[in-house]
Swiss-Prot record:
This is Elongation factor P. It comes from the Bacteria. The modification N6-(3,6-diaminohexanoyl)-5-hydroxylysine is found at K34. May be beta-lysylated on the epsilon-amino group of Lys-34 by the combined action of EpmA and EpmB, and then hydroxylated on the C5 position of the same residue by EpmC (if this protein is present). Lysylation is critical for the stimulatory effect of EF-P on peptide-bond formation. The lysylation moiety may extend toward the peptidyltransferase center and stabilize the terminal 3-CCA end of the tRNA. Hydroxylation of the C5 position on Lys-34 may allow additional potential stabilizing hydrogen-bond interactions with the P-tRNA. Belongs to the elongation factor P family. GO terms for cellular component: cytoplasm. The keyword Amino-acid biosynthesis does not apply. It is found in: Cytoplasm. The keyword Cytoplasm applies. The lineage of its organism: Bacteria, Pseudomonadati, Pseudomonadota, Gammaproteobacteria, Oceanospirillales. PANTHER family: ELONGATION FACTOR P, ELONGATION FACTOR P (EF-P) FAMILY PROTEIN.
Length: 191
């Protein structure tokens, strides 16, 4: 594997720390008034999800992690695993466990594309697209004139996610939702 210097590490870089693949969240270069410069690096363990900070001397190197982000289509869940298929034409399938799926579980929709992080051929993490279109399964009915005061109400989507929506949204409507914040963006167009 190739090595990467602390000065070359950027947010999103993948490195091996203590034998585990980690993603760099933040890299802060510190030059104290006295002593040698160092880098304070915030890391997230890709296997466990644990986040911590570690200090490295300026110029230290770490081994790059052999992780691969792959576009995959969500197929189904059997209750224990969530199954994904590669969209590159190989039809290769991978089963992700609950720790790999994590918070993305509430945005999983069949036949939708997701980014699956693979390490040694096993899924470590599943990331949802920034925006996804989902149908409203349950919400209070909209009443004529509700839009005047600009309030909101909870709506439960087909995946089980709860999103606050404007009062005029009804059951069966398809919404565009920001998966990063979990907020309603708009009604889906073309449906």
């Amino acid at each position: 594997m190739a090595n990467i210097s602390t000065s070359e590490m950027r947010s999103g870089s993948k490195v091996m720390v203590d034998g585990d693949p980690c993603a760099i969240i933040d890299n802060e270069h510190v030059k104290p008034g006295k002593g040698q410069a160092f880098n304070r690096i915030k890391l997230r363990n890709l296997k466990t999800g644990r986040v911590w900070e570690r200090t490295f001397k300026s110029g230290d190197t770490l081994e790059t992690a052999d992780v691969m982000d792959t576009d995959m289509e969500y197929l189904y869940t059997d209750g224990e695993f969530w199954h994904f298929m590669a969209v590159d034409g190989s039809f290769e399938q991978h089963a992700a466990d609950e720790t790999a799926v994590g918070d993305t579980i509430k945005w999983l929709k069949e036949q939708e594309k997701y980014v699956v992080t693979l390490y040694n051929g096993a899924p470590l993490a599943v990331a949802a697209p920034n925006f996804i279109e989902l149908e409203v399964k349950e919400t209070d009915p909209g009443v004529k004139g509700d839009t005047a005061n600009g309030g909101s109400k909870p709506a439960f989507l087909v995946t089980g996610a709860m999103v606050r929506v404007p009062l005029f949204i009804n059951i069966g409507e398809v919404l565009r939702v920001d998966t990063r914040t979990g907020e309603y963006v708009s009604r889906a167009t073309g449906k």
